[in-house]
UniProtKB/Swiss-Prot annotation:
Belongs to the chorismate synthase family. Transmembrane segments: none annotated. One of its GO terms (molecular function) is FMN binding. This is Chorismate synthase. Pathway: Metabolic intermediate biosynthesis; chorismate biosynthesis; chorismate from D-erythrose 4-phosphate and phosphoenolpyruvate: step 7/7.
Length: 358
């Protein structure tokens, strides 16, 4: 099975299945000498962890990370960094009655069509539990980026038709929706609980930003920065849309309103007076804040009766019980941050190979 490794210089490989013994990752290409805080990696995993609130899955997993290689005396050695998280609360028995049925909205049918065989225990490799490796690897990327003054942040900006109206970043980790608008966050929690009671689920939007990114990152033509970021985001389970800057709003704009005038800043650097472009022009970073939004579909595992077929094509009814997220948004926030950090770390190191004075 190819496609388990992401990046060219700073590379992440993830492994493991939802109900297997463990999941994990290997980070290769991390320069030696980077301070690696296991506590920071654990905090990032805790933000992604199931069972953290009433708007997430009830599965109880400590997600305790173990660093197996590549770190000595708190610093990266330059060798591959391998990290492991054991699955301690897997309950494959929840899937016994539906293992021969194709769950609507899931990858069951497509994996069968591709491989002719699949791990039916919670989706196996296609489960979002695979993203543990992404968040752990993304934490390493964040530690590398921090040395260059680059930071990444994300938040829940929309749930259904509820949209954040105020952006107060200090509120993001103060509420279980990770929404920067405290008033709207409370409404979102109520909406999620309504959906859960109705045996349904909800989708929404997460906004992701990167700050301190220097101009010049990105590789034309096919490895444009937004192309690699787009691939990274679309590789996350449940993501159905990605937009940068004004996104699809550009369809309603003119060139004169969308163009961002270039200016000379007080410190002598060149920037733009506005940021409709979202920090990337021609596939290369401009030095402005990188701004993107990702749309997540409602989780497919719902307890409502649904129509489907079994592997033989026979009609069947299915109800998916067990422990599932009514919305992916709060746990998507750290995953999206991780993927953006991985792309930026990779392109930062690639840029250092592109010119001798980089």
């Amino acid at each position: 099975m190819p496609g388990n490794t992401f990046g060219q210089v700073f590379r992440l490989t993830t492994w493991g299945e939802s109900h297997g013994p463990a999941v994990g990752c290997v980070v290769d290409g991390c320069p030696a000498g980077i301070e690696i805080s296991e506590a920071f990696i654990q905090r990032e995993l805790d933000r992604r962890r199931v069972g953290q609130s009433r708007v997430t899955s009830a599965r109880q997993e400590p997600d305790q990370v173990q660093i197996l290689s590549g770190v000595f005396e708190g610093r990266s050695t330059g060798a591959p960094i391998s990290m492991l998280v054991f699955n301690t609360d897997a309950k494959p028995g929840h899937y016994d009655t539906i293992k021969h049925l194709y769950r609507p909205g899931h990858a069951d049918y497509t994996w069968d069509a591709k491989y002719g065989f699949r791990d039916w225990r919670g989706g196996g490799r296609s489960s979002a539990r695979e993203t543990i490796g992404r968040v752990a690897g993304g934490a390493i990327a964040k530690l590398l980026l921090a040395r260059y003054g680059i930071s990444v942040i994300a938040w829940t900006s929309q749930l259904g038709d509820l949209k954040a109206e105020v952006i107060d970043e200090s509120e993001i980790e103060r509420n279980i929706m990770r929404c920067p608008d405290a008033r709207v966050a409370a409404l979102m929690v109520e909406r999620v609980e309504q959906a859960r009671r109705s045996l349904d689920s909800l989708g929404g939007v997460v906004e992701v930003r990167a700050r301190g990114v220097p101009p010049g990152l990105g590789e034309p033509v096919f490895d444009k920065l937004q192309a690699d970021i787009g691939k990274a985001m679309f590789s996350i389970p449940a993501i159905k849309g990605v937009e940068f800057g004004e996104g699809f709003g550009v369809a309603y704009m003119t060139g004169s309103t969308h163009n961002d005038p270039f200016v000379r800043r007080d410190d002598g650097t060149i920037g733009t007076a506005s940021n409709h472009h979202g920090g990337i022009l021609g596939g290369i970073s401009t030095g402005e804040e990188i701004v993107l939004r990702i749309a997540a579909k409602p989780p497919a595992s719902i307890a409502r009766p649904q129509h489907t077929v079994d592997r033989a094509g026979n009609p069947a009814a299915i109800e998916i019980h067990g422990r599932h997220d009514p919305t992916v948004l709060p746990r998507l926030v750290p995953i999206a941050e991780a993927m953006l950090a991985l792309v930026l770390a990779d392109h930062l190191l690639r840029q250092r190979l592109a010119r001798v004075d980089a």
